[in-house]
């Protein structure tokens, strides 16, 4: 009898242990997190000076701010403060991680100028590359042709005029972190030039782009050292950027993938847009979806920087939008 009681007690304790273990397991069992696509809202929407030719050409992200460069063709409007210099001006503007303006600067001369790309050196200076219009050499006085002298049929025509400038002077502006120009470096070329990228490599900058005419263009590459000395032009093969491909960005422990236009996302069953929509998705190291955001407008560029997050530049109607999404790493 005593043996039976001990056996019964042992069985009861075993049952309690198993029940407690099962209960604990049920309480701690991981439940898959339901990820939804969140619509990103631009931190900054701007139409620059509101002129038809205004544009943002490039964007650069630091650990605390976002810089963007481009062209303005009219007088300054809020939130910008720098005054107009010439017909069209290059410019650089810097905003913080919330989209609030820090400073802006117009670049150029009284001629036409544009800014097309930007990089930073080790100190933190911004190096903005662009183009300035160089006045054409005048060999004789140019006058409008009188239509009545050569128009024997009496048809009304406009007087013929000769253009007095062209965008053939490549310019690099060195701007410090407070928005002051430190130096300007100029390189004359034989034709219309369009630098499309500038990158910093150890002790020098590498500038690439197109040069030639509207009929015939070729790629070029030129180097620039920290003292403003340009190397000789080197022919460079022009490679068209791929379209419709997925862009992967390493972001801390995670990986961000940018899809230029999708209707379905693996792992997010609730995502069912009616039209193709640009989306960024953050994946954990294990490959699980951690977060997802849809982006507004026509996306021009996407980048990520620790301290700021993901930064997307978009065309939204007649304006530009900069969306800053923190917490994707």
What are these regions (language model features)?
Residues 1-11:
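Bacterial N-terminal signal peptides that target proteins for export
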Residues 12-14, 31:
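Generic short amphipathic/hydrophobic targeting helices enriched at N-termini
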Residues 16-25:
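C-terminal segment of classical bacterial N-terminal signal peptides
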Residues 25-329:
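A sequence-level/structural motif corresponding to short, flexible coil/turn segments enriched
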């Amino acid at each position: 009898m005593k043996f039976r009681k001990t056996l019964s007690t042992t069985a009861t304790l075993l049952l309690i242990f198993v029940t407690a273990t099962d209960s604990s397991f049920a309480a701690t069992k991981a439940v898959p997190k339901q990820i939804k696509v969140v619509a990103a809202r631009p931190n900054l929407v701007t139409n620059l000076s509101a002129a038809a030719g205004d544009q943002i050409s490039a964007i650069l992200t630091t650990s605390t701010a976002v810089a963007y460069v481009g062209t303005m063709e009219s007088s300054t409007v809020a939130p910008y403060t720098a005054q107009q210099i010439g017909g069209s001006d290059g410019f650089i503007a810097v905003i913080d991680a919330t989209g609030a303006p820090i400073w802006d600067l117009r670049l150029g001369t009284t001629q036409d100028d544009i800014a097309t790309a930007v990089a930073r050196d080790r100190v933190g200076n911004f190096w903005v590359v662009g183009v300035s219009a160089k006045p054409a050499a005048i060999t004789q006085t140019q006058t409008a042709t009188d239509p009545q002298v050569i128009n024997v049929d009496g048809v009304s025509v406009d007087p013929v005029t000769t253009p007095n400038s062209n965008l053939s002077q490549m310019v690099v502006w060195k701007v410090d972190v407070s928005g002051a120009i430190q130096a300007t470096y100029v390189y004359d070329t034989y034709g219309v030039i369009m630098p499309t990228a500038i990158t910093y490599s150890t002790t020098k900058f590498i500038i690439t782009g197109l040069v030639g005419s509207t009929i015939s263009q070729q790629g070029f590459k030129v180097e620039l050292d920290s003292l403003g000395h340009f190397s000789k032009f080197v022919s460079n093969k022009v490679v068209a950027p791929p379209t419709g491909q997925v862009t992967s960005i390493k972001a801390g422990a995670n990986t961000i993938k940018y899809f230029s236009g999708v209707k379905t996302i693996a792992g997010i069953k609730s995502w069912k847009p009616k039209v193709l929509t640009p989306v960024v998705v953050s994946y954990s190291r294990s490959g699980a979806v951690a977060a997802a955001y849809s982006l507004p407008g026509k996306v021009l560029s996407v980048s990520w920087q620790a301290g700021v997050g993901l930064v997307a530049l978009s065309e939204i109607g007649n304006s530009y939008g900069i969306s800053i999404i923190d917490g994707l790493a």
